[in-house]
Amino acid sequence: MTPIESKAQHLLRLRNVSFSYLEGVETLHNINLDLAPSEFHCLIGRSGCGKTSVLKLAAGLLSAQQGEVVWNNQLLIAPQSDMGFVFQRPTLLEWLNVLDNVLLPIALHRRIETSDLHKAKELLQRMGLAHKFHGKPTELSGGQQSRVAIARALITSPRILFMDEPFASLDAITREELQHDLMGICAEHKTSILFVTHDIGEAVYLGNQVSVMAQGKIHHTLAIDLPQPRQNSMRHSPEFNYFSAKLRHAMEVVA
């Protein structure tokens, strides 16, 4: 990566980024986004508005055709080793047990050490899967598979997680449990998160900042000023309803 000037308080910055999949058809236009260390930043918008494309550009999975993506004060041109990824489908390897699936990002680069095993077990215990170390992914529920995917993404101690609607296919109760556990474990590790969702309640519960997208643009970024740590009981509070209504209005205005 190429060192460039950037504000020290920002871990990730997108500046005036535009992108097209097809020549002459602009998918994203003039995207500006800042993400600070330990920040949970949600991207929300209707299907097809460009949320996933922004996430891929921010992660170096796509290259901006205009503007720049700055990661840790360096111009980003490819995904980095201190980035982690969780997508909607956990994509666990069925022939490996749960523990080996979590250790896979390390095993692809070097031999597994005792400290790696301890860390993998601690992450799985934190995700409520201490009894599943040696089980196979096919024996797990959808929520449990998502927990394994999160542990796998955290095993390399990334500075940021890129998450693309990771809980969209889960039932409401499981989704809320995972949201709560994700916030807790990432707060412990001081991990930043860029999180794509179409769910207003999810964005308000998780996000410190929420950017509203429509038609390939970020139209608004709202600060969600709710107490930390977040608790499930908060979902029924007047403050939560206030920010949910504010976010819904922002989405309706730009639709």
At which residue positions do the language-model features occur?
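Helix-to-loop junction immediately C-terminal to a conserved catalytic motif
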Residues: A59
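Conserved ABC ATPase signature
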Residues: K136-L140, Q144
